[in-house]
């Protein structure tokens, strides 16, 4: 895997994804290899290394609005959701992303 799967694969169109939400600045899609029955990834469409390095407050608000909207839909459809982001050594792909999850972990 590259350092930035989201820029190199998803945003470039090299890896086709099932979109859940899209705006000019944010994309949400079903994870290509889900770890939960519902596993949606929400990303900014420009490269941002992590939550700790984002300096564009407008983009951060747009991203969190998308996370909130996707999570609300998951709660409506499945009764519950988790929202997760990883930092430091826990962050495999060095592109800010949030996971919106529901159900019991499947792998």
Predicted regions, residues:
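HIT superfamily nucleotide-processing domains
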Residues: 1-107
């Amino acid at each position: 895997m590259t350092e930035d799967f989201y820029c190199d694969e998803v945003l470039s169109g090299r890896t086709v994804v099932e979109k859940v939400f899209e705006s000019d600045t944010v994309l949400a899609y079903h994870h290509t290899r889900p770890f939960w029955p519902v596993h949606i990834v929400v990303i900014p469409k420009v490269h941002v290394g992590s939550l700790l390095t984002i300096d564009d407050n407008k983009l951060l608000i747009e991203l969190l609005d998308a996370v909130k909207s996707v999570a609300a839909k998951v709660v409506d459809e499945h009764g519950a959701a988790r929202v997760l982001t990883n930092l430091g050594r826990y962050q495999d792909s060095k592109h800010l992303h949030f996971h919106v999850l529901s159900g019991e972990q499947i792998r």
